[in-house]
Amino acid sequence: MSDPGFLEVVTTWIALLASYNDHKTIRAIKEVLIMEKELFDYVAERAGVLATADTSKQDTKDAAAAWKDAVAADNSDAAVEVATTKLLDFLEGRPTTIDGVIAFAQGPAKEMMGEEAAAKMLEAQLARKEAGAKYCNCPSCAAASELLAKFGRIEL
């Protein structure tokens, strides 16, 4: 995620701090770098789901692929932040709410999936709503809502 220059600076600082035996500072720097990588991996994993899931609409697949292409072309922190913000802006308002899934199960799902499958879907979604779920749990909606929640744009 960071450019080589950034990593060189961090490595130099770690070496400098190590010479002063400042283990708390070294540990703090390592934790920040690990957290940064974990967040990048979190976004990358969900972008991968959005780009390939059968439940994703084409424009969602395109937005996720654009994120992947952008960070592959320029993995500097600034470029990753811009690409991630663009993806999050696109995703806002897209995950289907639990009420939307329930309405689907009560109506169109009956024709598309049959009465029995729609009834099972409805039962499962009503149970999820009762347990506090706010969004659809299909792979695309789950990935999108997890990303939006991670960046504080929605609450799960």
Question: What are these language model-derived features?
Answer:
Residues P4-L7:
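Short hydrophobic targeting helices and cationic amphipathic motifs
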Residues V10-I34:
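Short, Lys/Arg-enriched N-terminal segments with co-localized hydrophobic residues
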Residues M35-D69:
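Short terminal alpha-helical segments
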Residues E36, K57, D77, K134-N137:
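Amphipathic, non-membrane alpha-helical segments in soluble helical-bundle scaffolds
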Residues T60-M112:
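Aromatic-anchored, charged helix-turn/loop surface patch used as a conserved interaction hotspot
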Residues A117-L156:
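Amphipathic alpha-helical binding modules
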